[in-house]
């Protein structure tokens, strides 16, 4: 609507110190509230309160409003939501009255029938500016200190009916960070905030001091916080719903329905400016949990790698013994099991030296894995090896003998060359080299399908170096 009407007031009010308490409570209520309040704020602003809110008299109850005005002011004053309205009432300073929000259905006709009065609006703008200066810097304006005593009892009302305890600390942070434009968009009545608290008695600190919270303030009245949270758990969207009449509440509901289609943008602003207190409170622990999980994952990964290395050493030790016992199995068992394992373990082993920055070890491991994967660990369990061999295409009794070709001398020579290379690199501690050359072809009951021609072999095997492996056997 006519948001530009607010320009002088916003410009004159650079920091909203007061938007802390009143907007805390304000936000507790439904998000439609923000939009409707903005709208009525504009409406009443336009019509300059000529509909019965007497801005020149220091009374919050305007003449024509009668009982409705009382209702609106008394009940919402407790919550600190509607008190935002009565700037004009307190100082004769402004038309910024939102008194009729809950019964806006009834008073809407009044708004529409009124005609804006520009001159009074300008005068009230000037008054507002003076008032802001006085409220922001009470020590500079002694007259102001003396004059609006009734406005200084802010703390009493808020602490008697404290805001939602969850929302208190994080909300204040958000409001301090946001600039006035954001506050205006999200439906915060920044201009009307300062005198927004209810008048309980004429005593109390200055407005400015009352609005700036002390760091340790929230837990001052723990019992009341508890009662407040209980009320909220019951599910009333307005904690002190009992204080205002059902009729007013229903009227607000009806107007909220009318405006609901267009509330989305304001809701978005509300969420961005001040996410719900639960989010704010849970954000920190959630972050720490995530970081902890990350570090745990890394440490677990490193532990697992260490464990793998230890297991490798144990298996290396057991390899020598198992090879003496299982000479007949040695070559063809190691073929399949190591092809499968080496594909997986090659990655692990290459990762560790990269972390340590040891380039020579990396190159050695790459040589080992790409040229001769069979040099790795033998499994201690024969049954597991049998199972693996069957899965990879080994057969117990050769039904297809015609496909098995004898190993040629060229293949044996190639095998010896590769094994010598690896021995130079120091990667072969024991066993397979001498056994591979000694146990000439005691195949036993198992036949290896890798003896097929290399063209078929490419289809059946998985390792990238399979062809050279076949030659090696």
UniProtKB/Swiss-Prot annotation:
Residues 194-204, 251-286 have a biased composition (Polar residues). Residues 93-107 have a biased composition (Low complexity). The keyword Phosphoprotein applies. InterPro entries: Vasculin_fam. GO terms for molecular function: DNA binding; RNA binding. Residues 119-133, 293-329 have a biased composition (Basic and acidic residues). Keywords: Activator, DNA-binding, Methylation, Nucleus, Phosphoprotein, Transcription, Transcription regulation. Residues 456-473 have a biased composition (Acidic residues). GO terms for biological process: DNA-templated transcription; positive regulation of DNA-templated transcription. Signal peptide: none annotated. It holds the Pfam family Vasculin. It is found in: Nucleus. The modification Omega-N-methylarginine is found at residue 87. Coiled coil: none annotated. The keyword Phosphoprotein applies. Functions as a GC-rich promoter-specific transactivating transcription factor. Interacts with GTF2B, GTF2F2, RNA polymerase II and TBP. Belongs to the vasculin family. This is Vasculin. The lineage of its organism: Eukaryota, Metazoa, Chordata, Craniata, Vertebrata. The gene is GPBP1.
